[in-house]
Each structure stands twice: as C-alpha cells, then as structure tokens.
Amino acid sequence: MATVIHNPLKALGDQFYKEAIEHCRSYNSRLCAERSVRLPFLDSQTGVAQNNCYIWMEKRHRGPGLAPGQLYTYPARCWRKKRRLHPPEDSRLKLLEIKPETSHLPGKTELITETEFITKMSVDLRRFLSCKLYTSEVDLPLKKDGFTSESTTLEALLRGEGIEKKMDTKEEDPIQEIQRVLENDENADEVNEEEDLEEDIPKRKNRPRGRPKTPTWKKIFQKNARGSGGGRRRNDAASQDDHDKPYVCDICGKRYKNRPGLSYHYAHTHLASEEGDEAREQETRSSPVHRNENHKPQKGPDGVIIPNNYCDFCLGGSNMNKKSGRPEELVSCSDCGRSGHPTCLQFTTNMTEAVKTYQWQCIECKSCSLCGTSENDDQLLFCDDCDRGYHMYCLNPPVFEPPEGSWSCHLCRELLRERASAFGFQA
C-alpha cells in the first residue's frame, strides 16, 4: 500500500520541491502556448472548430473563497455575443440643408458656409466614430444635374455631392480624415463579422440535407484534413525516390542513381546555358537551322551518319572553341551525329584519347557495351577513362550499387593499368 507523504517539503527538501513546482509551471506554460498557436483547429472526432478558452487562470486572478470549503474563487467570464448598435437618431449627424445661391437673397436667413459646415461635421464624426457608433442614413435632397440622391452623410461627404469640388488644401483635410476613420472602422467591422461567424456556427453533427453554404475557414480546415492522407503518401513516395536516386542536379532538381549520369546531364543540359547570351544569339542568326538539324541526323548516300561541324555547347567549330578561344578537334556521336569539344564535354585526357578508338555515343544515345541495349539507363555505369556504358547487372561479377569515386571498365584497367582513373580504388 502506498505511503501518504504528509509533509512533502520535509521528505523531498525545500529546494527540490521548489524546482519541481517551477518545472511543472514552465511545462504547463509551454503546453498552453503551443496549443494557443494551433487554435482554432478542426476536431477530427466532432468536426467542431475549437477556439481558445478561458479556463486557465493566473495567480493574480485569485479571490477569496465565498462558499464554505472554498479556498479561492476566480472571476467568471461569461460568453457574450458582440452587440451591434443600431444607428443612433442624433440630429447632430444630419447634414444641414444646403440651398445654393439663396443665402444672398434678401429676407432669407444666411446659412453656414461650406468650410464651417465640413469642419463641424468632421469634429462630430470623429467624436461618434471613436465611440464605435454608426452614422444614420438620412434622406439628403442634394441636387446634382436635376436628380435627387439618397445616401448616408458620410457617403455624401466622400462623394462631395451638392458641394463645390473646388476647395483649398485646408478644406480637403477634414474629408481625408473622415475617409481614414471610415476605412479603419470598416476593417474592424469585417474582423467582427468573421468572429461572429465562428461563434454562430451550430455545433451539431446531424445537419439537414442539401448543400448549405460552408464558411471559408471551414473549407480550409476540411481541405487540410482531407489532404493529409494523400500528402503523406506522396511524401513517402518522394522519400523513396530520394533514397533510390541520391544524386541531385542543383540547377533543375533532376535526380540520378549514379554520379556519371548526373555529370552527363549537367554537361548536356546546363553547360550551354552558362554561355553568354550574345554569343548564342549571334550564332542563332548566322545558322538558324542548326538546332533543328540536331534532332534529325543527316545521312550520306552510303547511309553513314554525317556528323555536325559545330559544337553542341559552345557552337564553335573545330577551328575555334568559343569557350577557350583556341582550336580544338570535335568528337561526334556515331548514332545521332552530334558533336562537341572534349573540354565542353568535360572529358579527361584518357577519355579524349579513348573516344577516337571506338564509335563513341552521346548521353542520349548511350547503350550498354556488353548487351548493346539502352534500356534501364538508370542501371548504366560509365567508365571514367573511355566513357563506355555498362549495365551494372551485365558486369562480371554483377554490381548492385554504383561504386563511390571513380570507376574504370575492364578494358581500361588492362590497357592503362596504373594510369587508370580508378587505379587503387577497385580490387
């Protein structure tokens, strides 16, 4: 049976007890702060939007107990719906009747001037709008082009109907002040309408049939609730794809399973975009059909592919590399006829020498040198010395994961030996 501790301070120690109470208080504070940030949220069990509550009191809210056995009492906070005041019927808010060209007639009482009228109205409006009162709608017979318009006093002031529009700068200041106060009051009114909308929603699960209008905030919550499952599945698929293809292009975000594939993608896709716009535009004007010719390789009478006489990246020929400004021999694909400078292709010295000894293929036409097929290109390994491609499952013994660092095929290891790029990295 558990032992009752009558005096926890004596059993645990004064300092330990104070620290425990302080930790408990800080934990509760953090928990309440975190919950208040997430409010309002849609309860998945009841479908009700949970708002902040007032059950959390502080020490300064304590009062003496009122009933027997009460140690403390806290002030009650009753729910109160925001009241909307009806437009007050105040005679001071009504515009005086303006009768132009009658103040100078003999026998008539002279009315106040327009400047005095606007100044007086601005003072009255500021006084009443500061108390959150709303102006009343009055019928104001303002003559404008022979028509009578009915509007509120504020709208009449803002539109300037029945009043001459030619005023000095000092006379325009009160109207600008009225407009500023009106805009602030309208913004506050919109916020109050949204709060009342949340309070007026019936908290019932059984609703009548039909398609009642769903509030905007609830549509957002329902959309988030519905989309959580699909988003989780999409995130799982994306994480699996990230695991399968760890090499990411930092320019376009395309992923590859091995580093050689990423290198070829960068060389053939983004290297040309780093060139100057002027050089590309100039070459486009001089040879506008070059880009179209790349997609359809030209064949000679004997059926042999005719290679392009310009680099696919810098658009220079064999007589000049526009990137380095020096002449350089072109390397052409045996399948599509595309050409490129070895430096533009980021070839090493071993690659530049090796591609002259066999029918080289570009990255779009690359196939396995053992089986001769180009399928499963994500399984292709490219030699860092001769640029040949090999399926990982076609190698002997098969390779299940792309090796880290440089990799050389069996031909280059036998031919180059210690000059091979992967010398010392492969067993």
From Swiss-Prot:
Region (Disordered): 182-244, 272-301
Primary location: nucleus
Basic and acidic residues composition-biased segments: 233-244, 279-296
Biased composition (Acidic residues): 184-199
Keyword Nucleotidyltransferase: no
Record key words, sorted: Activator, Chromatin regulator, Metal-binding, Neurogenesis, Nucleus, Repeat, Repressor, Transcription, Transcription regulation, Zinc, Zinc-finger
Tissue expression per record: Expressed in the heart and somites.
MF annotations from Gene Ontology: zinc ion binding
Assigned GO CC terms: nBAF complex
Alphabetical GO biological process terms: chromatin organization; nervous system development
Ranges annotated as C2H2-type zinc finger: 247-270
Subunit structure: Component of the BAF complex. Interacts with acetylated histones H3 and H4. Component of neuron-specific chromatin remodeling complex (nBAF complex), a subfamily of ATP-dependent SWI/SNF chromatin remodeling complexes.
Biological role stated in the UniProt entry: Muscle-specific component of the BAF complex, a multiprotein complex involved in transcriptional activation and repression of select genes by chromatin remodeling (alteration of DNA-nucleosome topology). Specifically binds acetylated lysines on histone 3 and 4. In the complex, it acts as a tissue-specific anchor between histone acetylations and methylations and chromatin remodeling. It thereby probably plays an essential role in heart and skeletal muscle development. Belongs to the neuron-specific chromatin remodeling complex (nBAF complex) and plays a role in neural development.
PANTHER family (alphabetical): HL01030P-RELATED, ZINC FINGER PROTEIN DPF3
UniProt record similarity statement: Belongs to the requiem/DPF family.
Protein name: Zinc finger protein DPF3
The gene coding this protein: DPF3
